[in-house]
Every structure is written in C-alpha cells, then in structure tokens.
C-alpha cells in the first residue's frame, strides 16, 4: 500500500502537471513519465492515464498512472475475468429482485427469469448492465463472495492497488472502491488473454432475452467504430469516478492498451474518444523497445 499512499500524495500535489520528456521515475517522484526524446503526449480530458503494450506489458507512457480513483463500470472487466474462471458459459442462474432493482444502466434482467453466464457477460460488458453484473455475481457465489474473488483475482495478476467494492462499480459497503490506470490496464490485459472475453468485448452487438422478445444489446464502446483497429474496451461513469475507459487496439501486428480515469469533457474540447485515439496514435508511433515501466 506504500505506492498507493504515494499516489494519493502525488495526485493531490501534482494533479495539474503535464507530461515531460523524462525517464521512468517512481510515482512518488513524478506522476508523468515517457521515454526521453519521445514526442509530447497529446492533452485530453482525462488527467490520469496509461499507454502500454497489450502483449509484452511494457508501459510506454503514463500520467498519474499509480493514482487511485473510483473505477465505475470499468471494474466489470474484473468481474468478467473472475466469472470466466469460475463458471461455464452455459451455467444458469435465476435473477433475484435484489440483483435487478438497482441504479441503472440496466440491461433488462427480470427477476424470476433464468439467464446463462454468457448472456450475463454480454449484458455486463456491452451495455454495462448493473442488473446483469449483480446477477452474474450471484452465479459466482453472491455479492460478497464475488467481490472477494474479484479482489483475489486482482491481487493474483499484480493489480495490487485495486479494491473492488461491488460487482458493478456502483458504491458498495464502505464506498466506491478504487483502482489505478496501471492496474486497470493490467486487468484488461489479463482479461484479453481469455478468448471468450476478447470475443465479447469486440462484438458490436449481442442478442438478449426479454419479456418482449429478443433484443440486441449494442456495444457502448464507441472506439470500435471510431478508431480503425480497435479490438475492445469498457466504459464507465459515476459522479465520484467521472469518466473512465479502458480499451485496446491493434495496428500492424502490434496491440496497445490504454486506460483513462477521472476525466470530464469540456464543451469545445476533445472528447474521451478523441483522447483515446490520440493516446493510441502516439503509442503506435513509439519505438516498442522503449518503455518506462511494466504492467
């Protein structure tokens, strides 16, 4: 937790700093790092971000990448990764009122209806359904057990500055939980190593059963249609977290992951999607042998 405490201090004292051409440094020394002599990283609405190689785990650049922020719905990537290790895709669960009567975004999960793990994964990742996330957590063992397993999974993959408070990213007992851009990228990297997760997060839509019939769930990751080579991602927003995003793209056989946290879009300024595209473009232009840290 020493790095987490240092990141809190850095985020308080150096929140407005800009990226400079410096070599890698501990988070407590400088929250913004990129290789010496590399091009300046474009500005955007997210003050806390990371760009890394999805395959090697090498970090190309970051700003406040060890600073903790509430994850909002990006924590659903950790839920999905945990569920994929715990249950089969055709495992079923009956939705409960407690799981479905939640603050929305909602996918339309109905109490008393039976759903498969695959249907709930689609609804959790594509449209960020909090009802689907809670029901998927029930399939894993229930709210508390699922959250414990999510935190154990995070620790196992090296995301040691992450604490999930709920399956959905909404506040749980004690608050909203936290993660860092570094950990969020590491979690997404681990999830993308699972072919089922990679297929789900890349699909533009998926069918979902409702009382009115099957309806399509449309992927909320706009980078899939805005950025050539985008291969998946997860959005998030709460008042505490502001806008969050984690995603990946491929170009010429090279895959990058980005994570962006605690941003607000200002009228007339670049959008989150603009910043995501700029970070990816910057990363693809860099020498893959140069890095500042590892995931």
Where in this protein do the model-derived segments appear?
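Secretory targeting and sorting signals
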Residues: 1-29
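A generic alpha-helix preference that emphasizes hydrophobic side chains
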Residues: 10-11, 121, 181, 276
């Amino acid at each position: 937790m020493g790095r987490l405490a240092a990141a809190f201090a850095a985020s308080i004292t150096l929140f407005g700093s800009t990226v400079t051409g410096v070599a890698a440094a501990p988070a407590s020394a400088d929250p913004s790092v990129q290789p010496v002599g590399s091009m300046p990283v474009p500005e955007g609405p997210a003050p806390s971000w990371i760009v890394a190689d999805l395959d090697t785990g090498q970090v190309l650049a970051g700003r406040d990448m060890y600073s903790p922020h509430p994850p909002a719905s990006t924590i659903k990537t950790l839920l999905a990764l945990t569920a994929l290790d715990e249950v089969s895709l055709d495992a079923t669960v009956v939705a409960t009122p407690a799981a479905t009567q939640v603050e929305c975004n909602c996918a339309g999960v109905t109490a008393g209806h039976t759903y498969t793990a695959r249907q709930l994964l689609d609804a959790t990742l594509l449209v960020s359904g909090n009802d689907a996330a809670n029901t998927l957590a029930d399939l894993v063992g229930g709210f508390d057990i699922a959250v414990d397993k999510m935190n154990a999974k995070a620790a196992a993959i090296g995301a040691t500055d992450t604490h999930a408070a709920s399956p959905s990213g909404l506040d749980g007992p004690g608050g909203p939980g936290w993660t860092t851009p570094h950990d969020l990228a590491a979690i997404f990297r681990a999830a993308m190593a699972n072919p089922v997760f990679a297929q789900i997060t890349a699909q533009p839509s998926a069918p979902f059963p409702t009382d009115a019939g099957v309806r399509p769930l449309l992927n909320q990751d706009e980078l899939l249609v805005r950025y050539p080579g985008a291969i998946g991602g997860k959005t998030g927003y709460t008042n505490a977290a502001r806008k969050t995003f984690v995603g990946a793209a491929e170009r010429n056989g090279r895959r990058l992951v980005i994570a962006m946290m605690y941003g607000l879009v200002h009228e007339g300024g670049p959008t989150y999607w603009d910043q995501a595209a700029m970070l990816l473009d910057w990363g693809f232009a860099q020498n893959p042998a140069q890095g500042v840290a590892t995931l």
